[in-house]
């Protein structure tokens, strides 16, 4: 927990810097690849994901360490060659886990958040799930376990492998010559994120594209068919927590409503998007059958509400960093409570960004939650008062001002409509 949190303290500012550089480069090139609300949603999704991971809120069905202890044929030392083997096996496992999440109904709920943006930029890379509460990727790593690759090697390689998947979420880099034959490049991953029928469910590779070429899921990007980003059933919200349960809730309702007992069972394991015929007829859902039909979600928040949400995001990030810096000194109960407050904060300001009629109520509950935590700590905020006197009550004052600002924004006419941004062809 603590080691991962410290790694994130270093990695997250680096990611944010790259996102800023990409946005500046796109602006200089005259390309529209970002929308404010979409970026807030993406970054907020990343916050919820890392909080879940740092708190260890995942049930491991079977661990790699257990596999090594029980099925290893040989015992080997951690040489550079072993690290290379571990990287390749981890990438192989990632390919199959990724493919499973795309092609099986129940597992799509774990991954839909990552594809829910109707843009494609570096901030989209941070759209990660909180609904992947079980882990069984180790089942795809049996070859490494049989060879006796030490668990500590996998633990070392895993975050490197994960962070290395960030850079290719961009429209600003064209095709990369000979690297296209071996590595996952921005061009390959643009295809993966596209909703075009030709591109759908292709290019599952995470670092190496060779798995797609071996297993028949490779598709090159075509100049004649620019990718259109998003999902076939648009999520229509900026709230990452709602996105994380949308597909699951649809499956639950369909399983309940169908008259067929067989359909109640098989709906979970059918190809993604499958619905019982009787339910699909009685309860149709919005679906984009052609990229030409896509109308990008826009809640028309206006510039004032966007500024309010950006400021809320900035404060939430700052509080998250304080949690990560203090995580080794706090009892787990306090860490859990702190993490819950951050998640509630994300839920609140993204609900406001959707211009939901419940946004003020949710913000009131968040402020009450935060102030009660400060009161219990005698006016402090998890040790921050040692560096910033009156930190707790100062935070309370800021939250009350945010609440007052939201009440005022809700009482004014909505902002003028934001312009739709073109899909845009990749830079050649």
Regions of interest found by a model, annotated:
Residues 1-15:
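Hydrophobic transmembrane alpha-helical segments in integral membrane proteins
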Residues 2-5, 56-75, 138-154, 158, ...:
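Juxtamembrane "helix exit" motif at the C-terminal ends of alpha-helical transmembrane segments
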Residues 8, 119-124, 167-309, 358, ...:
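Cytosolic/stromal cytosol-facing helical appendages immediately following the last transmembrane segment
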Residues 20-40:
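Membrane-interface helix-loop junction between the first two transmembrane segments
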Residues 297-415:
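Substrate-recognition/cap regions that form aromatic- and gly/pro-loop-enriched pockets
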């Amino acid at each position: 927990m603590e080691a991962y949190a410290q790694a994130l303290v270093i990695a997250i500012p680096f990611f944010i810097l790259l996102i800023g550089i990409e946005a500046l480069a796109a602006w200089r090139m005259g390309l529209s690849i970002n929308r404010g609300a979409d970026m807030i949603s993406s970054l907020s999704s990343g916050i919820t994901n890392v909080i879940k991971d740092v708190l260890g809120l995942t049930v491991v069905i079977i661990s790699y360490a257990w596999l090594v202890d029980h099925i290893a044929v040989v015992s080997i030392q951690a040489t550079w060659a072993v690290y290379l083997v571990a990287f390749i096996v981890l990438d192989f496992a990632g390919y199959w886990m990724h493919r499973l999440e795309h092609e099986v109904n129940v597992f799509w709920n774990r991954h839909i958040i990552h594809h829910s943006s109707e843009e494609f930029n570096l901030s989209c890379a941070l759209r990660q799930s909180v609904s992947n509460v079980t882990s069984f990727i180790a089942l795809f790593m049996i070859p490494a376990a049989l060879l006796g690759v030490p668990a500590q090697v996998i633990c070392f390689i895993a975050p490197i492998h994960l962070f290395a998947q960030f850079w290719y979420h961009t429209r600003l880099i064209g095709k990369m010559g000979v690297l296209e034959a071996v590595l996952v490049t921005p061009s390959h991953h643009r295809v993966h994120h596209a909703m075009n029928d030709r591109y759908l469910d292709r290019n599952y590779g995470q670092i190496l594209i060779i798995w797609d070429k071996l297993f028949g899921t490779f598709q090159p990007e075509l100049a004649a068919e620019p990718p259109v980003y998003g999902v076939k059933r648009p999520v229509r919200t900026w709230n990452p927590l709602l996105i994380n349960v949308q597909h699951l809730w649809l499956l639950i309702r369909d399983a309940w409503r169908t008259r067929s007992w067989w359909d109640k069972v098989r709906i979970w394991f059918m190809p993604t998007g499958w619905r019982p015929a009787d339910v699909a007829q009685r309860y149709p859902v919005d679906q984009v059958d052609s990229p030409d039909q896509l109308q990008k979600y826009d809640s028309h928040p206006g510039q004032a509400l966007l500024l309010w949400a950006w400021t809320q995001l900035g404060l939430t990030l700052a509080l998250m960093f304080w949690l990560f810096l203090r995580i080794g000194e706090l009892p787990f109960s306090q860490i859990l409570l702190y993490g819950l407050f951050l998640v509630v904060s994300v839920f609140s300001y993204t609900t406001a960004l959707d211009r939901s009629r419940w946004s003020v109520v949710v913000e009131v509950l968040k402020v009450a939650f935060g102030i009660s935590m400060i009161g219990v700590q005698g006016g402090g905020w998890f040790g921050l008062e040692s560096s910033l006197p009156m930190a707790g009550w100062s935070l309370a004052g800021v939250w009350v001002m945010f609440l007052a600002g939201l009440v005022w924004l809700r009482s004014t006419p909505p902002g003028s409509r934001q312009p739709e941004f073109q899909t845009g062809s990749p830079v050649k």
